[in-house]
Amino acid sequence: TLRADAARMLVELAGDNMGLFTQELEKLAAYVGKQQQISVDDVRTLVGGWRAEQTWAMTGALRDGNLPAALVCLDKLLTAGEAPLKIVGGISYVFRKLAHATELARRGGRLNTALIEAGVHNRELPQWERYLRRLSRRRAEQLYSWLLEIDGGLKGNSRLPERLQLEHLLVRLSGRTAK
């Protein structure tokens, strides 16, 4: 069985290429064997490889307030030929959950509970809760719009170079103010 969160990650990593999606799903099925479920960790390990690890390192660096490390990860991904939209897919996979949790908390829920409901893993709850508090509610409420803006920008709605658009997104997500 493919867990819902693992399926979402697989879609983000494989993109809209059904042939690649099917190939990766078959590879995962063989990898897990008789296990009952295919997990996010299985997808990250088998499908994502080095590029996925760089993406998770980048989002972790943003979470921890380490913008320079996040920019180094971005540079490695771009230098390796990773497509900017694919990089944004990995970033969006993480930050859409945080945007959803922010909306749930805005409606009166506790942030910790909202993060769980949004799909953040229990072992990462304290770090992401600290991140959102550092970011501020006002900026956290802009997460969805930032993700939409970069998606449109990379699809031709911006004159800025792709790298600059990605770097600007990382600055925003880090909680720093772009000058």
Whereabouts are the PLM-identified features?
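Small-residue-rich helix-loop
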Residues: 35-139, 177-178
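Non-catalytic interfacial helical region
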Residues: 1-59, 151-161, 165-179
